Amino acid sequence: GLGVNFIENEGPVFTKPIDSPVDVNNLAHFNPSDLDYVYKAVTNIKNSLPDHIPLIGFCGSPWTLAAYSIEGRSSKDFAKTLNFIKANKSETHELLSKYTDACFLYLRKQVQSGADVIQIFDSWANLLKKDDLQAFSFDYVASLITALKIDPVTKNTPVIIFARDPDCDSEVLMTTGADCISLYWTMNNFDIEMSKNKVALQGNLNPKILLEDKETIKKETFKLLSKYKNYPGYIFNLGHGITPDIDPDKVKYLTDIVREY
């Protein structure tokens, strides 16, 4: 294995990152049972929830997994990763294929364990320009979703795709086959008329708004809700994760005003 550890305030760190094509060839086949503790947690959480509250399972996209495992840890520019894929294109595609297969098995087990919805996080989509984004990320996301949609266990499970600040237009995200597109907070030019009645949309609010006063939070939130109020299947959410500097009371205020809208 690659020896991954999750370090507080840093994220995943690999003790044996991928440094060469040989490392890709030597990568062990993923065994879903190695993550039994995840599936047990999914089952326990599902059993603790009221019936009307769905549980979302998730995984990183094949590209995001590749970026972390080549770089070895989070980075400002992922220079090692970008240099690797440029110099080793065929091995990169081999790695992405392996990760796609692993993600499918991992998500399938999550659904078997109680997950009602699946979300795929392409957290490092912003590293790639348009053509590379399609070739190294979205093509593999599409393959993953296709596999989920034809498997008897997962075929009826809704799939959400989140891509961080992607260099693409609306149609490209829709071609992944996802049932719902989670919008990064900068994606303000997304063609909602084109996607209407085809996919659900989620998110788009800048999470840093929660650092502002309540009046500003309400103003920006209502602006967003007004934009999507006639969109069938819009799910209110932030356009990225909540950071530690955000006051939980502001989060409660946000959820309260959304429900009152």
Describe the function of each predicted region.
Residues G1-E10:
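Glycine-rich loop at the start of a catalytic domain that most often binds anionic cofactors/ligands
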Residues G1-L2, P17, A66-I70:
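Short, conserved acidic/polar surface loops in the N-terminal third of protein domains
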Residues N9-S48:
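A gly/proline- and charged-residue-enriched helix-loop-helix capping module
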Residues D34-Y261:
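Active-site loop segments of alpha/beta catalytic cores
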